[in-house]
Amino acid sequence: MSGLTVVFAGTPEFGLSCLDALIQSRHHLKAVYTQPDRPAGRGRKLQESPVKEWAINNQVPVYQPLNFKNQEAIDELSALKPDVMVVIAYGLILPKAVLEIPRLGCINVHASLLPRWRGASPIQHAILHGDAESGVTIMQMDVGLDTGPMLCKATCPVTSSDTAGSLHDKLAKMSVKPLLDVLEALASNSAQFELQNNELATYAGKINKEEARINWHQSAVEIDRKIRAFNPWPVAYTLAEELMLRIHQAKATDIMSTEMPGMVLNIDKNGMLVATNDNALLVEKIQFPGAKVISVRDWLNSGKTQLHTGLMLQ
């Protein structure tokens, strides 16, 4: 049984573990599709995606169409004659004409246990909502948003210390085996499909920076989840006398408080204790504008005074 001719479509780091596995497998990675280079950083220089960098380093042809709305881009993909297209966080909607090009269709590696958290930010939403477990789903793509039939699932626990960054890395690594298993099943014509139950579907919309501001009238647990869900991006923040204070690490405590939500109750080497709608939140790592991420302990040792007991964070 010969290997499959695979075209990969993806943009961020999440797909790199699978690319490493694909190029070492018996399948033939014919080409990589990724989004066009984008201006980034203070200099606004064009920046290649992590997937493009990987492809160049591994001498795999790269294609970067703006979209698939023109026939030229569709013909270009069709000429590659892929058996299957593997899509991981590509960031472009694939029209029906593209989905029908590969002989065995397009399969997607999605970072949730579908049908829960269809959409752009499943990892963040799993943490925001306190899910006990997450995972990856390999599905056959159709024209809907993460609605296609499922081929394989793999689960992992979400711990109370997981951030979006740590959960991202766990899911990226654990997606390799399910993907290779599905490719083998497709190659041997033994793949089994399970339809999604649309009644159980939830949606994870795109995260934006405006959502990152902390509402101290929420519970300590909800704020803790938000801080972890928005780390490493966009990073949860509050205002300390008009200064933006980013909070990189905190944890809910069982210390009850009757003070106004947002009031700094205490600062010591363990952290900064802040009142919420119920129990206090212990803030452990912070960042002021233009400064590095620092522990509250190290900030105290620096002798600075922007933060103090009685301060109202907003």
From Swiss-Prot:
Annotated Gene Ontology cellular components are: cytosol
Q: Superkingdom of the source?
A: Bacteria
Q: What is its EC number?
A: 2.1.2.9
Q: Which residues bind (6S)-5,6,7,8-tetrahydrofolate?
A: S112, L113, L114, P115
List GO molecular-function terms, semicolon-separated: methionyl-tRNA formyltransferase activity
Q: What does this protein do?
A: Attaches a formyl group to the free amino group of methionyl-tRNA(fMet). The formyl group appears to play a dual role in the initiator identity of N-formylmethionyl-tRNA by promoting its recognition by IF2 and preventing the misappropriation of this tRNA by the elongation apparatus.
Family under the similarity heading: Belongs to the Fmt family.
Name of this protein: Methionyl-tRNA formyltransferase
Species, as recorded: Legionella pneumophila (strain Corby)
What gene, per UniProt, encodes this protein?
fmt
